[in-house]
């Protein structure tokens, strides 16, 4: 797909926007499992399927001919598994992403885990990610991106909420 240029960013989603947003997609975590654990499990399954191995039994009466054997995820993109970026909101999920060989996408959605200034926490998240990557023994170099959400102020209400004019706003 796209000549090997496709980069895919995924995460469990920003938790503050919708209460139990996963339910709107018919996902309900089993008893004793959090929505975050469910999302990580689904991600692990997805990563395995990206390797291109057959997993699904073909329909004996398909609309068009199938290749022999189990069917893989299509369209298949060689190397896409190495071009997956995990949007980590915590240090623990950054380390988890590193262990699984995903690239790290850090942003302003990082959760405050220590009360330290944001830039200190984000730098620590990246250090922990790189250490976990090294410990996992991956052959390739880890990739990290840092993004920041920017919102245009278009009216007086926006300015009232977001244009405080100090270092905090």
Protein language model annotation of sequence segments:
Residues 6-10, 83-88, 102-107, 142-148:
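Hydrophobic faces of well-ordered beta-strands that scaffold small-molecule active sites
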Residues 77-83:
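A local structural motif
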Residues 1-55:
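Flexible, glycine-rich active-site loops centered on histidine and acidic residues
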Residues 46, 97, 129:
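Conserved, mostly hydrophobic/aromatic
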Residues 92-120:
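A conserved active-site cap/scaffold subdomain adjacent to cofactor or substrate pockets
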Residues 12-16, 110, 148-152:
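Active-site-proximal loop/turn and secondary-structure-junction residues that shape catalytic pockets
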Residues 63-72:
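Active-site glycine-rich loop that binds ribose-phosphate moieties when present
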Residues 1, 7, 113-114, 119-123, ...:
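C-terminal amphipathic alpha-helical "assembly" element
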């Amino acid at each position: 797909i796209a000549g090997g240029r496709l980069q895919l960013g995924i995460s469990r989603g920003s938790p503050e926007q919708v209460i139990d947003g996963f339910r709107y997609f018919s996902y309900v975590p089993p008893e004793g499992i959090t929505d975050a654990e469910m999302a990580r499990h689904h991600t692990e399954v997805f990563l395995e399927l990206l390797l291109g191995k057959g997993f699904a039994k073909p329909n004996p009466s398909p609309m068009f001919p199938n290749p022999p054997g189990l069917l893989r995820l299509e369209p298949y993109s060689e190397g896409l598994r190495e071009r997956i970026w995990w949007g980590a909101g915590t240090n623990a999920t950054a380390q988890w992403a590193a262990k699984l060989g995903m690239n790290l996408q850090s942003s302003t959605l990082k959760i405050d885990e220590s009360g330290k200034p944001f830039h200190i926490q984000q730098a620590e998240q990246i250090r922990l990610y790189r250490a976990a990557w090294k410990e996992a023994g991956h052959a390739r170099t880890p990739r990290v991106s840092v993004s920041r959400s920017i919102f245009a102020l278009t009216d007086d209400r926006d300015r009232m909420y977001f244009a405080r004019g100090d270092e905090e706003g």
